[in-house]
Amino acid sequence: MGKIIKWILRSALSLLALVVVGVAYLVLAVDPNDFKPEIKSAAASQDVELTLDGNLSWQFLPQIGVVVEQVEFAHGSIASGKIGELSLSVSWSELFNIDLSGKQLPVGSIAINDATILLAELAPNTFPVQLKRFNARVNNFSLTGDRFSITASAHVFSGLALELEALLRLQMNTNTGVIEQITVSDLEASIDGMELSGQLNAENNFAIAQGSLRSNHFDLQQLVKTIGMSFPLVKLPEMASKDALTAVSWNSSFNTDMNGLSTFNTQLDIDSQIINIASKVDHSIHNLYMRVSGNQFDMTHYLAADSNS
């Protein structure tokens, strides 16, 4: 992840440097397409294979920048994809304050439109995830701890709609690619009827993290059916009540230390029945402790449809 951000930083600086040149020559004397080899070289230095089959053009309103069409990329076995249109821009007021030393990205915007992205392995022993019709916009992007916003949408699996928006603060060492600190606030996301909100604060490449995440009441049956369209083995049995698992919500908080003790506390609301789950992970000895508690839980609605007991 750090290498990808580092590559985006350097590539963005290279492209935004073209903006300065373009303004100096009133844009007419410079064709940004002539700089494709330099952009590919900057990507290759970060182990990213880049193909630029489309046109590069200037953008003037509402901000000045560069628009790149038909981008293909591959970053080893981590991610690959195609981007219909990528734009990098900077506000007019910040245009002449750009630091071209590579240490800081100027205040500006990054927009990705109509992309297809394959995430090969989000975590060990997981399956690839493909994001289709991926669109995203980042405003006032910064790697020095200043706050910026992000909005994104995509379709995953068989049309499962994802939407996300949040405010972030990101402090990254651009020399090593290490994320020293990241703060996510005002997180709002939706996944096919399930709405999520929360916040996160992490340090040292997520070695230490604290945060919380909660959902609305959503129809778990419908969500599993949608996922099952792509993964037939993912399905729920027919239960005694057709309303079982149609009003589910959860509220979770966590405090993790990958070199010490991590704690997770979750309250599940399953059709108005409350279950509390408290767990601890001792990473030093690879032990998991878990306690599940609740006043009572009526199982009659969740038994097999033909069960008489």
Q: What is the role of each PLM region?
A:
Residues 79, 106-108, 207-209, 262, ...:
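Outer-envelope beta-barrel architecture signal
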Residues 1-18:
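N-terminal Sec-pathway targeting helices
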Residues 102, 134-153, 183-186, 239-267, ...:
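Solvent-exposed beta-strand/coil patches in large extracellular/periplasmic or lumenal scaffold regions
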Residues 102-209, 215-218:
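Elongated, acidic membrane-bridging lipid-handling scaffolds
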Residues 126-128, 228-232, 306-308:
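Flexible, surface-exposed loop regions and adjacent strand-edge segments
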Residues 297-308:
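Soluble, acidic/polar mature domains that operate outside membranes
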Residues 49-51, 77-90, 124-136, 157-169, ...:
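Amphipathic hydrophobic-ligand
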Residues 20-111, 117:
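Terminal hydrophobic membrane-targeting helix
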